């Protein structure tokens, strides 16, 4: 059972950071969708809802996504769809349901960096960076490898690119956590492949485009480190890496990159 001793609505990021630093058990609550299922006591729950972090701002260079932006907003944003196709819609459509996605936040999903995260898998194939209150700007690739530190994720910035993207995953049942997820981004001959739910955190692989899909799929299956867990064996995941790599390569080859 989750118990919260004190609830504080931060008036500024500095105040939120100060509250977070006072006790290692204090917590930024985000959308509270995963947090509420934990059995723990939080001395001070810190809410960022009044700090204007719940919108997506489009600029000439890219999209600045606030950490409190909901997954539903990410899913339905027309600007993101124009530049990145159905990447985000495909990544979030199986995350429980619309009601859940109306509350779950992008920042909470990315900060957690769960191995099964469809959100991390989708962002990792893009030219993106996270903005942290203390540490500043960090590339999404570097952030995916970092340990957990006492900091506040405020924004995610995604640069506009002329790319073709796709997302694929395998689940045992609809809305279940993925057995394996993958994303891809193609910019002419530059290829970025991401494999997540291995079951560890998603990993980015940078490759050169080839029409020999079979060879690249076999290479990925042999390269990606997979492990066993309750949802699937190491061997099963390796076969999924092969199959999903083939599927994604075919998807980004179907149309010319804009």
Feature annotation, model-predicted:
Residues 1-258:
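C-terminal structural segment of proteins
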């Amino acid at each position: 059972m989750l118990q919260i001793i004190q609830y504080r609505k931060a008036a500024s990021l500095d105040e939120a950071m100060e509250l977070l630093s006072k006790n290692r058990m204090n917590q930024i609550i985000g959308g509270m969708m995963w947090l509420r299922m934990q059995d723990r006591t939080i001395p001070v729950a810190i809410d960022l809802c009044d700090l204007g972090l719940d919108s997506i701002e489009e600029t000439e260079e890219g999209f600045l996504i606030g950490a409190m932006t909901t997954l539903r907003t990410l899913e339905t944003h027309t600007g993101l769809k124009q530049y990145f196709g159905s990447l985000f819609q495909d990544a979030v459509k199986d995350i429980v349901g619309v009601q859940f996605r109306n509350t779950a936040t992008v920042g909470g999903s990315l900060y957690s960096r769960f191995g099964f995260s469809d959100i991390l898998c989708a962002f990792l194939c893009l030219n993106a960076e996270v903005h942290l209150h203390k540490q500043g700007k960090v590339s999404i690739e570097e952030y995916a490898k970092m340990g957990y530190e006492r900091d506040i994720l405020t924004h995610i910035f995604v640069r506009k690119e002329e790319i073709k993207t796709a997302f694929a995953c395998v689940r045992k049942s609809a809305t279940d956590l993925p057995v394996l997820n993958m994303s891809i981004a193609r910019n002419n001959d530059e290829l970025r492949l991401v494999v997540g739910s291995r079951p560890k955190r998603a990993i980015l692989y940078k490759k050169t485009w080839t029409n020999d899909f079979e060879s690249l799929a076999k290479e990925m299956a042999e390269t990606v480190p997979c492990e066993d867990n309750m949802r699937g064996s190491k061997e099963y995941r390796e076969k999924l890496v092969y199959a999903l790599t083939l599927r994604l390569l075919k998807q980004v080859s179907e149309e010319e990159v804009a």
